[in-house]
Amino acid sequence: MKIACLTFNPIQENTYVVWDDTSEAVVIDAGNSNPREDAALDNFIAEHGLRPVLAANTHGHFDHTLGVAHLKKRYGIPFAMSLKDAFLLDNASTSGSIFGVPVGEMPSVDTDLDTTPEIRFGHTVLRVLRTPGHTPGGVVLLCGEYLFCGDTLFAGSIGPVSYTHLRAHETGA
C-alpha cells in the first residue's frame, strides 16, 4: 500500500490518496477547494497512473468534503461516508462562511459507512471503525499499522488539543 498526503483549502486539511500495485486508489477526506487544488489532485493521480474507485470520508465537515463533488464528476466514483453526518453536508455553506471559505456543490452519499465494515480496492482492505465524538458519524479507516482518523481527536470541537490537564497532572498543580 502507498499513501500520499496533500494539504488543501484555507483550513489546511489533509487529503490522503491510498493505492496499491493494482493502481486502484481511494481518496480519503478530499478537501480540494478550488480549480487550482482540483488540478493538483488530478495531476497527482495522473502522474502516478492511478484509477480512483472511491471517495471516502472520516466525517462530514465541509473542509473534508469540499473536493468530493469534483472527484465524483471527474472520475465517476461513488462517495462513502456515514449518513449520520449527512446533515453536515446540508449545512456546509453556512459552516464554510463562518471560516471565510466559499463552499460549492456538496456531494450526495452513495455508501453509508455505518453499515459498511470494510472498504476493498485492489488488494487493499480498509477496516471501517465507528468513532463518534467529533461528529455523530465519525469513522476511522484502518489498514495494517495505518490509521486514517480525520479529526477524531477533536471531540466536539476543532483546533489545537489542550494538554492543560496533563500539565497539571505532571506538575502536581
Predicted regions and their residues:
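Conserved beta-strand hairpin/beta-sheet module of binuclear metal-dependent hydrolase folds
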Residues: 1-48, 140-150
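Core dinuclear metal-dependent hydrolase active-site scaffold
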Residues: 3, 17, 116-142
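Short catalytic-loop micro-motif centered on adjacent basic/acidic residues
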Residues: 26-29, 54-57, 128-130
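Active-site metal-binding loops of divalent metal-dependent hydrolases
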Residues: 30-32, 60, 134-135, 145-146, ...
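Active-site HxH/HxHxD metal-binding segment of metal-dependent hydrolases
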Residues: 32-38, 42-121
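A short acidic, helix-capping loop that chelates divalent metal ions and anchors anionic groups
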Residues: 88-91, 156-162
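Well-ordered beta-strand scaffold positions
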Residues: 117, 124, 145-146, 152, ...
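Conserved small/polar residues in nucleotide/adenosyl-binding loops
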Residues: 164-171
